[in-house]
C-alpha cells in the first residue's frame, strides 16, 4: 500500500513573500506567494513549489532561520535561506533552501557508542543559536556556523515507567511579533515534563511534571506578550494554559472537539499576533481562539490569576476551507506580512486561503 504524503510543518519567511513546507516523503519545498492582485482568488488554488529537494532518509526534525527570506540583503548576517534537518543515524545538517546542498554537518555523535544521536527537536533562535533535543532529555546548543556544541546538558531526573525521556519540542514564539530573545527557553519531553534551558547555567531545570494519561508534550506555544504558555500533548483533547511565572499549576484549558492521536497526520497549533491561536482539525476545518483571549490566558477580567477554578474554553470560531472535509487540515500558519492570508496543509497538498473566504 502506497504511503500517503503528509506535510510535517510549514515555515513562513520573515517578510511573508515565501514559505517552506516539509513532508514525510523526505521532501523540502519552497513556495512563492502570488502577486497581491491574485491572492483574493486563492481559496481553491493549490500551489506548485518554486524549488524543492529530497533527502535520502526521513526527516525527524527541522527548523528554519527566523530571518529566512529570499530577499535578504543584510550582508552582516549569514544567508537566511537555511534549514537544519535531523534524522536517524545521521548528523544534524544545515542545508541551503535554494539548491538543496548540505553546507555544514554538526557533531551529534555519542562519544560512548560512536553512533549519531537522533535529534528529535530543533530550533534556531534570533541570535543564530541552534538548539537540539535528543534522548535522555539531552539538550545541546550550537553556533549555526560551527559544528561543535558550545553548551550541552541533560536532566538527571528519570522518566516514570512507560514514559520516554526525549526532548520533543522547544518553545515557539508568535511569527510577526517582536523577534527578541526572551531569556531562557522552555522545552518539553514525551514524559510530560517542561524544562528551562539557560546556557548561563550548567544544568536543565525541570519546571513542570504533569501526571496525566496524555502521551507527551508535542508543542509549547507562547502568547505574544510572553506571559502565558500553551502546551499541546498527544492523546489529549485539550490544550493546557500556564502562567509563565507559575508553570507548576494549570491555569485553564482550551477544549478540542477531537483527541490528538499519535499518528502520521500530526495536527499543529499556531499562535500569531493578529488572530490568536489556530489549529486544524481532522475534518478539514480550522479552530480559533482570538488574540484577546490568548493574550490573557483565557482569564476573564473579573477573575484573579490565583483563582483555583480551571475553565474549559471551547473554540471561539471554526472556519471552513472549501477543501475536502475528509482530509485533515494538519498545519495552518498565517503570513506575517498579511495575517488574513494563511498557508494550509491538507494531506500532502499545500494551498493559500484567506480567513472568512
UniProtKB/Swiss-Prot annotation:
Top-level taxon: Eukaryota
Species assigned in the record: Saccharomyces cerevisiae (strain JAY291)
Oligomer and partners: Associates with snRNPs.
Xref: Gene3D superfamilies: YVTN repeat-like/Quinoprotein amine dehydrogenase
Name under which the protein is recorded: Protein SWT21
UniProt-annotated location(s): Nucleus
Gene for this chain: SWT21
Presence of the UniProt keyword Protein biosynthesis in the record: no
Disulfide bond entries: none
Protein task: Involved in mRNA splicing. Helps to stabilize the U1 snRNP-5' splice site interaction.
Family named by the database record: Belongs to the SWT21 family.
GO biological process, one term: RNA splicing
Any one GO cellular component localisation term in the record: nucleus
Main location as per UniProt: nucleus
InterPro entries, per the entry: SWT21/TCAB1_mRNA_Telomere, WD40/YVTN_repeat-like_dom_sf, WD40_repeat_dom_sf
The keyword Mitochondrion is assigned to this record: no
Keywords: mRNA processing, mRNA splicing, Nucleus
